[in-house]
UniProtKB/Swiss-Prot annotation:
InterPro entries: Anticodon_Met, Met-tRNA_synth, Met-tRNA_synth_2, Methionyl/Leucyl_tRNA_Synth, MetRS_core, Rossmann-like_a/b/a_fold, tRNAsynth_Ia_anticodon-bd. It catalyses: tRNA(Met) + L-methionine + ATP = L-methionyl-tRNA(Met) + AMP + diphosphate. It comes from Dictyostelium discoideum (Social amoeba). Its main location: mitochondrion. This is Probable methionine--tRNA ligase, mitochondrial. Keywords: Aminoacyl-tRNA synthetase, ATP-binding, Ligase, Mitochondrion, Nucleotide-binding, Protein biosynthesis, Transit peptide. Its EC number is 6.1.1.10. The gene is mmetS.
Amino acid sequence: MLKLLKQISTTSTFKKPSSINNGFININLFKNYCTSVKQEDKKKVLITTPIFYVNGPPHIGHLYSALLGDALGRWNRFIGNDTLFMTGTDEHGSKVDEAAKKNGLKTIDYCDKISNRFRELFDKADIKYDDFIRTTEPRHKEAVTAIWNRLLERGYIYKGVYKGWYCTSDESFLTDDQVTEGMSPITPQNPISKKCMISLESGHEVNWIEEENYMFKLSEFSKTIENWFEEVKPIFPAIHVNLLRYMLSQGIKDLSISRPSSRIPWGIEVPNDPSQTIYVWLDALTNYLTVTGYPNVSPNSSQSHWSNATHIIGKDIIKFHSVYWPSFLIAADYPLPKSIICHAHWTVNREKMSKSRGNVVDPFLAIDNHGLELIRYFLLKGGGLENDGDWSEHELAVRFKSDLADTYGNLISRCTGKALNPSGEWPKSVTDTSLFTMDDQKLIENSSILVKSVSTHYDRGDFKSGIFEIMTFLYECNLYVQNQAPWKLVPKPNRVGSDLIRLNTIIYIAIEMIRITSLLLSPIIPTSSNLTLNYLSIPLENRSNPSNFKFGYNYHQNQNNLKLPKEILILFHKK
């Protein structure tokens, strides 16, 4: 098992490049360092979001999960990986059946309606998924049947009687240590709270049940899973491992992986036993194999994207993805995921989002009211992997004005306007490095450090930290232009001391910073980034591959297009 664990790579750390020495740079070494993202053979990568439960319409938290996956997918395509990014909907279980009845629809018709709503949201939000899986699809039933049979054949499934606590809302069994006396939560369906046993994990009501189920030998994998946590460190951020360590230290019992079909009819039946329905979590988790072509393509095959899988999940489902799922995979003799990126939740003005409070944020309305690019930016910068993000209309306005309009947008309009460039021509490449001042060198050096640091953040799905560093650097770029005062160098009648060479150098460096940061922002705000790169006449072939982070792009390579566009690019119109 440890051999398997060590095969999963860990993220490398950033070291200050040897080309930097006391604020000056060896320009030749620096040019090599600018291709700072490691060039490797193209590899298959699988990126997954949770599949979203269709017992209700999508909310802003669902969109956040999908955006994390989308940004990670875009980044992996940028660096040249053969990327399969999937999302989808989880459509089985009692809660879905109940929701369909409340809406007066057949269960499959209800699933179609809500699943389509998720797809509409992701299309509206420019989520570039490669596969949208539904657990009601025939291909998924085939995959679930296959993994059930494999676990059965390998001796990890047996029939037994389960006695214990069951939470219908969470569709999860709980031990005595995971429940306590409490009050049932108030919901539209149950407006009066009552004394009952509740889950310590979710606060939802639990009931004692005794029934015959198929059981999975989960207890056999406790030590192996613990070793996986310690040896491979697959869960990011590591803070989320603490709860799992505690859970394992308390001991884990065998897991019921079926329900009587008389109680849970809406699901995939156990092979050769129609009296039982497969547990919704074994069903749902298997979707990650379904999208790779399983069972027709083995997860052990080098041709499968499963060989390098990253799951993006919310903290509320970490137990299922980090204990149950790897145990199923080990039992089936399939590789484990490379990493599990676990994110926190969203509050609204520091309050928990809930229907009873009436503060659930509709993502469709949010995009309509604020525009897609701002919503993408706000969620990816404001959301948290460790701590909950907070939805605030005030913060939306602040982020728009401070970051997008005043910092990124201002640098673009400032450096391409006629005030600094009355000739309206692209600046010439600066090949004579003796023309660089210490301030020039420092900014170029910092752009290289930025690329390396942001790449490290992006590789592990920490877009919040990456965006923070980009915006800090863009603020530095604006300060650089302010301090260099290029407007004093623009030739004008009766002006003495104009210096066209120095003016060209300042504008060239500033525009290069715009190009490099636009590439870095392309997974976050793809439309705005592409509009900027279009404006700079950057060909499509120069908008991917880490080599394009290299400082020194020749804007004069197209001799037929030496002029800047006549109209200044204004990406973000202030309201």
